[in-house]
């Protein structure tokens, strides 16, 4: 029997799981995914933590302890999420060691309410880096205009960064420049480049969701272009990756021991039930990439994914033709990606607010029970 996930790994794609929970950690499920499903990393976000904390009783003891200490909700949130991420870092540490720090990484996101505040994002990133205190940690920072200098500064301080919420190739170019800037400054500061790493999380399925919604309003022949924008956009991002990491600026950094910032495909579950559930995995295969998936997508690839080798390089002309055709139809690419960035931040802010409200209720309940 073939193993599509093994084939995906052999094609140069690092498979990460886009989920975390104390249940997954305590039952050994994450360790099993590493052992049996070729998973070599973990990503998290406020929505994932919200579902985990609301849906499990395994957080109650820590919540009671936090209530006794009288901490506020922000400190409680930081403690709860850092605990899980630190645990996940320990589970993935053998992968980190075996791959010389390339994989075995776990990501934790800064408070999304700080997405447009550079200095606050830097301060939060430092706090999380110190709190989790694991070499295989990534701090997730959104690729907003205000996030770009924060990304560079964190890297300059030796903090490994997962740049999130990238939707456009133009913003991706800016992210790579911020990465170069940060690594150059890290070298000047004498940081250990063997420990410093970064990935750039390029969001995929949401692009199709937004573009397809606009195509449906146009109707007619425009509908033939549905479900094509996201893969084309990601393929052109990989072309940018190849171009930027072939420049003399990068070659000078690589000569000093720097590692490239890998493209990471995020938002890879299909939102349209009419599409193949492995679409954003099998169509985005190329060496040196990461694909982070919810467990449902991971299992779908394992069950019936067809890995055809490299499905990115060699498709650049087709990808550009797709975006050109969409522009001819009146699809404003910049407006699409600006909308997605704004909505992406808003969604994570909303999830964080909901999570904070749930934790507040839990803290108050624990305090009432203690007072009886």
UniProtKB/Swiss-Prot annotation:
Organism: Acidothermus cellulolyticus (strain ATCC 43068 / DSM 8971 / 11B)
Catalytic residues, chain numbering: 140 (schiff-base intermediate with substrate)
PROSITE patterns recorded: TRANSALDOLASE_1
Compartment annotation: Cytoplasm
Family: Belongs to the transaldolase family. Type 2 subfamily.
EC code(s) of this entry: 2.2.1.2
Reaction(s) this enzyme catalyzes, per UniProt: D-sedoheptulose 7-phosphate + D-glyceraldehyde 3-phosphate = D-erythrose 4-phosphate + beta-D-fructose 6-phosphate
Protein name according to UniProt: Transaldolase
GO biological process: carbohydrate metabolic process; pentose-phosphate shunt
Pathway(s) where this gene product acts: Carbohydrate degradation; pentose phosphate pathway; D-glyceraldehyde 3-phosphate and beta-D-fructose 6-phosphate from D-ribose 5-phosphate and D-xylulose 5-phosphate (non-oxidative stage): step 2/3
InterPro entries: Aldolase_TIM (IPR013785), TAL/FSA (IPR001585), Transaldolase_2 (IPR004732), Transaldolase_AS (IPR018225)
PANTHER family the record matches: TRANSALDOLASE (PTHR10683:SF31)
Any one Pfam family match given in the protein's UniProt record, by short name: TAL_FSA
Gene Ontology CC terms, in alphabetical order: cytoplasm
GO molecular function ontology, one term from the record: transaldolase activity
UniProt keyword annotations, A-Z: Cytoplasm, Pentose shunt, Schiff base, Transferase
Function text: Transaldolase is important for the balance of metabolites in the pentose-phosphate pathway.
Transferase recorded as keyword: yes
């Amino acid at each position: 029997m073939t193993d599509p996930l093994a084939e995906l790994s052999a094609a140069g794609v690092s498979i990460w799981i886009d989920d975390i929970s104390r249940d997954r950690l305590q039952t050994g499920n994450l360790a099993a995914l590493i052992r049996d499903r070729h998973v070599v990393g973990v990503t998290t976000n406020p929505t994932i933590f919200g579902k985990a904390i609301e849906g499990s009783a395994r957080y109650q003891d820590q919540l009671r302890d936090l209530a006794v200490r009288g901490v506020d909700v922000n400190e409680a949130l930081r403690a709860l999420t850092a605990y899980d991420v630190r645990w996940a870092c320990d589970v993935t540490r053998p992968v980190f060691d075996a791959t010389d720090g390339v994989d075995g990484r776990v990501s934790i996101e800064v408070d999304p309410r700080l997405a447009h505040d550079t200095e606050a994002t830097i301060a939060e990133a430092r706090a999380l880096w110190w709190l989790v205190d694991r070499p295989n940690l990534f701090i997730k920072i959104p690729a907003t205009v205000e996030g770009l200098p924060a990304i560079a500064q964190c890297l300059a301080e030796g903090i490994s960064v997962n740049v999130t919420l990238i939707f456009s190739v133009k913003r991706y170019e800016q992210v790579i420049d911020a990465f170069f800037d940060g690594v150059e400054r890290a070298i000047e500061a004498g940081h250990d480049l063997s420990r410093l790493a970064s990935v750039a999380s390029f969001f995929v399925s949401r692009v199709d969701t937004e573009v397809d919604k606009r195509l449906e309003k146009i109707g007619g022949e425009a509908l033939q272009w549905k479900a094509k924008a996201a893969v084309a956009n990601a393929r052109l991002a990989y072309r940018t990756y190849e171009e930027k990491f072939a420049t003399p600026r990068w070659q000078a950094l690589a000569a000093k021991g720097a590692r490239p910032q890998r493209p990471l495909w995020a938002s890879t579950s299909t939102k349209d039930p009419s599409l193949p559930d492995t679409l954003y995995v099998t169509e985005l295969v190329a060496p040196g990439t990461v694909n982070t998936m919810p467990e449902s997508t991971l299992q779908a690839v394992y069950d019936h994914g067809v890995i055809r080798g490299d499905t990115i390089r060699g498709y650049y002309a087709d990808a550009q033709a797709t975006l050109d055709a969409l522009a001819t139809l009146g699809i404003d690419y910049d407006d699409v990606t600006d909308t997605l960035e704004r909505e992406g931040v808003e969604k994570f802010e909303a999830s964080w607010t909901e999570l904070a409200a749930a934790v507040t209720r839990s803290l108050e309940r624990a305090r009432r029970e203690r007072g009886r």
